[in-house]
């Protein structure tokens, strides 16, 4: 999904929606960036994840995935080829590096997320989370779109 917004001052903002992990969405983003030529790229990950992606690109290492990431990848693979780290993030980093532009992470950092999580999660939420994870592992999904 792509949508361009024209601001009153003449600035254009392009919103690109992709599925985290699908290789084809990374390829679509790469093509979109080449056409749109942004001066700044914002991605829906925290700044610390951008640093990790850059380090990974310089010296790839084995990644450890959570249970949810494994389940997500397994289900997502029904819709196309999947890759970790997600190609949509990798392409954003590659583009920003190549054109020496600013890459902004716009999600909460780990400390902020942890604080919000601790302030809002209750014991029953954690129990529901465990039950939901168990159900997802045994659920059969029938969607034709990711």
For each feature predicted by the language model, list its residue ranges.
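N- or domain-start disorder-to-order transition segments that initiate the globular core
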Residues: 1-13
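A short acidic, amphipathic alpha-helical/loop segment
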Residues: 26-32, 92-95
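Hydrophobic, often amphipathic alpha-helical segments used for membrane interaction and targeting
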Residues: 52-146
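Short N-terminal binding/cap micro-motifs at the start of the first secondary-structure element
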Residues: 21-27, 52
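PAPS-dependent sulfotransferase catalytic domain
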Residues: 47-49
């Amino acid at each position: 999904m792509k949508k361009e917004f024209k601001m009153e001052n003449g600035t254009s903002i392009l919103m690109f929606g992709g599925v985290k992990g699908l290789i084809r969405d990374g390829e679509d983003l790469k093509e979109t960036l080449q056409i749109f030529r942004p001066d700044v790229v914002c991605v829906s990950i925290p700044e610390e994840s951008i640093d990790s992606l850059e380090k990974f690109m310089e010296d790839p290492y084995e990644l450890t995935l959570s249970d949810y990431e494994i389940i997500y990848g397994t289900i997502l693979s029904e819709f196309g080829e999947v890759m970790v780290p997600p190609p949509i993030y990798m392409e954003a980093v590659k583009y920003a590096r190549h054109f020496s532009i600013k890459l902004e992470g716009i999600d909460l950092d780990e400390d902020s997320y942890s604080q919000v999580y601790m302030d809002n999660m209750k014991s029953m939420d954690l129990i529901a989370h465990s039950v939901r994870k168990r159900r997802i592992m045994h659920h059969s999904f029938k969607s034709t779109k990711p």
